[in-house]
Design a protein with these regions (language model features):
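Conserved class I S-adenosyl-L-methionine
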Residues: 2-52, 66-67, 89, 93-97, ...
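C-terminal alpha-helical "lid/dimerization" subdomain adjacent to the S-adenosyl-L-methionine
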Residues: 13, 17, 34-36, 153-212
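Short glycine-centered segments of the SAM/dcSAM-binding site in methyltransferase folds
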Residues: 56, 76, 149-151
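Class I SAM-dependent methyltransferase SAM/SAH-binding core
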Residues: 58-112
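A short acidic, Gly/Pro-enriched loop at the edge of an enzyme's catalytic core
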Residues: 111-123
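A short SAM/SAH-binding and catalytic strip from SAM-dependent methyltransferases
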Residues: 122-134
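A short glycine-rich, Lys/Arg-flanked "PGG" loop and its adjoining helix->strand segment in the class I
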Residues: 136-148
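C-terminal lobe and adjacent flexible extensions of AdoMet/dcAdoMet transferase-like proteins
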Residues: 213-221
Length: 221
């Protein structure tokens, strides 16, 4: 399996300051740019979340709130994001579309969230894993705030294993700070396959560029 450059060894690696700077720049154009290409993956992730048991949903990396109108009646949603500018857009969407199922939107580091253990039935992270400085810390923190037996849902771009796309993604890696995400982010950087295996792995359009993953937190003994 092809591996990404990973963590501190990355060229042009992201830190919180770089993420905030990038999404301050992208906030005004995100919906009409990346928002369009990411729509199929976003819809599939929320459709899966809507089918999973439990009412309390945490959306990690809520961004401009593009997914918020898609949640089914009966789900309540709390969203977090590191970017104040993206959250402003999300709050405007909640008010404009009267999304009463959205209980709160908070500026928060997804790697160290201010929620008690087991606060949510499921956590959803769409196009977030390749943005945070430490994806393993993100995975661990999402696991912590989800109740035993609950689910973690991800949709994300992952590094190709071979072919021209792999070359392009590696060539783009030094631009991570400018882009606001890691083009060479490999799936094993999210979770150690020896420790956590997804129950669902589903390629998403366009052209299988994104992948939907679902992990179940083991039930309490």
């Amino acid at each position: 399996m092809t591996k990404g450059t990973g963590g501190a060894g990355r060229s042009g690696g992201l830190d919180q300051a770089a993420v905030k700077t990038a999404y301050r720049r992208w906030a005004g154009v995100y919906d009409t740019g990346f928002g369009l290409v990411s729509r199929p993956g976003r819809r599939r992730a929320v459709a899966l979340a809507n089918r999973l048991p439990g009412e309390r949903v945490l959306e990690v990396g809520v961004g401009t709130g593009l997914a918020l109108p898609l949640y089914a009646p009966g789900k309540t949603v709390v969203g977090v994001d590191l970017s104040r500018e993206m959250l402003l857009k999300a709050r405007e969407r909640v008010e404009r579309e009267r999304l009463t199922h959205v209980l709160g939107l908070f500026e928060m580091d997804a790697q160290a969230m201010a929620f008690a253990d087991g606060s949510f039935d499921l956590a959803v992270a769409m196009f977030t894993a390749s943005v945070v400085p430490d994806a393993r810390a993100l995975f661990a923190e999402m696991t912590r705030v989800v109740r035993p037996g609950g689910y973690l849902v991800f949709v994300n771009h992952f590094l190709a294993e071979s072919g021209p796309r792999l070359w392009v993604e590696r060539a783009m890696a030094p631009a991570a700070r400018l882009l606001g995400w890691h083009p060479d982010f490999a799936r094993e950087e999210l979770a150690d396959p020896a420790v956590a295996e997804p129950e669902i792995v589903e390629p998403c359009p366009p052209f299988g560029l994104f992948t939907l993953l679902a992990y179940r937190r083991p039930a309490a003994a």
